[in-house]
């Protein structure tokens, strides 16, 4: 491993401006960042992650003015979402402008855009815009892990997974654990009403309340995190409802992720016992990675109850169990 671990956002911005890669902290998960207008740099994201070329990337920008530069059409309801949830863990999908090249859109006519809430990520973006004298500069940054695997919520997770594929010009900006722990909500804004493409901390109810509109139905737009099997550790994931936990036959030595208050069945290894849904989201990926570090063959996961963020956590568990 010959990359540089750094603590100053300006160093990350400089590496990005020079078309190198940067592992970056956001409020959701750590991202593998590249200058979004550089085919060479973005191409390295796909190579490093072994990511399919038709799988679109999210362009991280500084503010809603930049969004208007990257999108060819921004409907009124999208402005309501920007005002309510940006900066923050929500990605919006628009018809793309000429700024958005095929290599970040997966060949689609749409582009996914987010204004991140992480102060450090915003500092990187601000510095990048200054270095390039372009206020609309963007960072393409999918999760900093191999495609289909568990997203990293610490810099160490990212370094363990892709560190051997980074060069001495690439950098890792370590800012500690991510606050939210699961990826952003993705909202399709290419039609006459919003449609949820990926669940996250911003809930369907939040979107409907902010826009005053009912959500639309299915969408043909491709977005990150929509594959049936995703977010998967090497261990097999067994989703078990709370009522079934005492009756479920489970392999001896399996790991357990379950809300606090639920006992650990005999012979199993407790990996996480979050007290709230927010704690569950923040700790889920760390616990799945711990299962792999302990070389467990199976992880039994009891999802959180409720709706909203709990639905997003259940979505990640369900996709992990499909692998």
In which residue ranges do the predicted regions lie?
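Active-site-adjacent structural elements in enzyme catalytic cores
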Residues: 1-323
């Amino acid at each position: 491993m010959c990359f540089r671990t750094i603590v100053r956002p300006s160093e990350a911005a400089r590496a990005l401006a020079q078309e190198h890669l940067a592992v970056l902290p956001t409020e959701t998960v750590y991202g593998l960042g590249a200058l979004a207008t550089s085919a060479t740099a973005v191409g390295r994201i796909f190579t490093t992650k072994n990511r399919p070329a038709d799988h679109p990337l999210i362009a991280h920008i500084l503010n809603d003015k930049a969004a208007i530069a990257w999108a060819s059409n921004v409907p009124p309801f999208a402005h309501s979402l920007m005002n309510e949830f940006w900066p923050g863990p929500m990605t919006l999908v628009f018809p793309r402008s000429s700024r958005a090249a095929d290599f970040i859109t997966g060949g689609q006519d749409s582009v996914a855009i987010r204004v991140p809430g992480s102060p450090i990520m915003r500092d990187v973006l601000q510095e990048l815009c200054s270095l390039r004298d372009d206020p609309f500069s963007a960072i393409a940054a999918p999760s900093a892990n191999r495609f289909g695997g568990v997203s990293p919520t610490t810099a160490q997770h990212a370094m363990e997974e892709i560190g051997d594929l980074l060069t001495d010009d690439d950098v890792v900006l370590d800012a500690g654990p991510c606050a939210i722990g699961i990826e952003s909500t993705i909202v399709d804004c290419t039609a006459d009403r919003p449609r949820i493409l990926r669940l996250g901390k911003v809930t369907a109810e939040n979107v409907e309340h902010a826009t005053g509109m009912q959500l639309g139905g299915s969408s043909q737009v491709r977005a990150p995190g929509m594959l049936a099997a995703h977010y998967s550790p090497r261990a097999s994931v067994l989703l078990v409802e709370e009522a079934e936990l005492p009756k479920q036959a489970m392999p001896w030595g399996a790991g357990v992720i379950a809300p606090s208050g639920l006992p650990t069945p005999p012979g199993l290894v407790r990996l996480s016992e979050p007290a709230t849904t927010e704690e569950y989201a923040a700790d889920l990926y760390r616990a799945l990675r711990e299962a792999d570090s302990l070389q467990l063959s199976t992880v039994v996961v009891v999802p959180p109850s409720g709706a909203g963020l709990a639905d997003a956590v259940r979505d990640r568990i369900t996709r992990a169990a499909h692998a």
